[in-house]
UniProtKB/Swiss-Prot annotation:
It is an enzyme of class 2 (transferase). It catalyses: L-lysyl-[protein] + 3 S-adenosyl-L-methionine = N(6),N(6),N(6)-trimethyl-L-lysyl-[protein] + 3 S-adenosyl-L-homocysteine + 3 H(+). Its main location: cytoplasm. Belongs to the methyltransferase superfamily. PrmA family. Keywords: Cytoplasm, Methyltransferase, S-adenosyl-L-methionine, Transferase. PANTHER family: ELECTRON TRANSFER FLAVOPROTEIN BETA SUBUNIT LYSINE METHYLTRANSFERASE. GO terms for molecular function: protein-lysine N-methyltransferase activity. GO terms for biological process: methylation. This is Ribosomal protein L11 methyltransferase. S-adenosyl-L-methionine binds at residues 139, 164, 186, 233. InterPro entries: Ribosomal_L11_MeTrfase_PrmA, Ribosomal_PrmA_MeTrfase, SAM-dependent_MTases_sf. It is found in: Cytoplasm. GO terms for cellular component: cytoplasm.
Amino acid sequence: MAYNWWVIRVLCNKSLEEVIFWRLDSFGCRGTASQIQGKNCLVLAYLPEEQTQLLDLSALSLNFRQDALCMNFPVPIMDWYLIEEEDWASSWKQYWQPQEIGDHFLIHPAWLDLPEQSDKIILRLDPGAAFGTGTHPTTQLCLESLEMRLGLEPHPEAIIADIGCGSGILSIGAALLGVHQIYAVDIDPLAIRSTINNGKLNQIKAEKLIVEQGDIKKLIKLCPKPVDGIVCNILAEVIIDIIPHLTAIAKPKTWGIISGILLEQAKLIGDTLEQNGWVVATLWKKEEWCCFNIRYS
């Protein structure tokens, strides 16, 4: 039996992209993509027809409006329409092309042929319904920070933790940069599946990338000893709650890469980090977003 799918399109300011993704994920959407259009961003998402009603879609549009007004951005434009099942899984993929990030990474959609020659570290990705294609400034900042932190030399004993792994892009990036062991968690089961599948796409061994569904408390139980590094690219409101727990997996000189944070939220995050024993080494910025590079003292 064929099913129909809602296509939800949201045209918004680029700085709202992560909030839009979060709303769509919470709404139950499967498969998301985004395309930068000047100062704006076109976000697409898909939802089974039977899973929602028109009134629910209208309420979602109102949530987008309220988010934008609270953050002093223009109100997003949202519309929706139905397509048949065989079209939904691939229709969003036309909006996503290979993208270079930093000095060494090439994020490459899994359904496209690999380049015949490349001097880049090719990270193959099929995000499915999980957040993290490499197009968002916070993901780019995190990958660039990983490059800076790890370089291109192997790290045969290094262990890192990934909080809110999404598509697995940061965990896999770390593995491709030579990290020995990665522990990753996400509360979304679709993200867990996506991270595992993308690990296989990039020939990362399952024992190297340990992925479990859960929150920071699950991660603390998962890590057998303090880690060398922590990556976390999620909403600032969640980061605030997580920071006091980070010491449970940290040791002196553990480094961290923390993003998902608007510039206007940076002071609160920075103050909270310092109150919990972390030193802010650098603060990187891209558009309206920032990334903390930190160290545990």
